[in-house]
Design a protein with these regions (language model features):
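Compositionally biased terminal segments of proteins
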Residues: 1-174
């Protein structure tokens, strides 16, 4: 996956395209190591054409597209998969302002703050096929980062992106 991280770093520098590393790698950066087979990043939707152009130049092709994300696979190395989540500029700027630097095996990346990563995971868990994995990540992040998220913050995240019942269940892990 180092090749994908290196590519993302080069795109950021060459095109001044801010992006955040999300998904399993960001979960690992926040202290919960788990296997992941792809790389996920987050961009402002306004930067999507530039990102797609750069990925195409680097040998990637889009093989799945939904309103909020696109999945890319390398044409010659199909096990290299990059998911690009797209959000509006206001959401991205809020997350960018609070993001953290992270050294990914010598490659400088940025990851969402813990509260924003939890919001992404709780939002993703609303999709039936993702509940187990994403809520597992949420529980592991809460357990691995005691005291970093208050009960009120968790309640607010769940109210906005999940359900009140979920907040009640998760608060036991604070």
């Amino acid at each position: 996956m180092r090749i994908v991280f290196d590519l993302l770093m080069r795109i950021q520098k060459r095109r001044q395209l801010p992006l955040l590393l999300i998904g399993g790698w960001a979960v690992q950066a926040h202290g919960y190591a788990r296997n992941t087979l792809d790389v996920d990043c987050l961009i402002a939707i306004e930067n999507d054409p530039v990102m797609a152009e750069e990925l195409t130049k680097a040998g990637f092709e889009c093989f799945e597209e939904k309103p909020s994300f696109r999945r890319f696979r390398h044409r010659l190395q199909p096990f290299l998969i990059l998911d690009v989540m797209r959000v509006n500029a206001v959401t991205f700027e809020k997350m960018w302002a609070a993001c953290e630097d992270y050294d990914m095996d010598g490659i400088p990346m940025r990851i969402p703050a813990l509260k924003h990563l939890l919001a992404l995971k709780i939002h993703a868990a609303q999709n039936e096929h993702r509940v187990e994995k994403d809520l597992g990540d949420v529980l592991a992040l809460l357990r691995g980062n005691p005291g970093k998220i208050s009960a009120a913050e968790l309640q607010g995240i769940c109210d906005q992106y999940g359900t009140p019942a979920l907040a009640e269940k998760l608060s036991a892990f604070l």
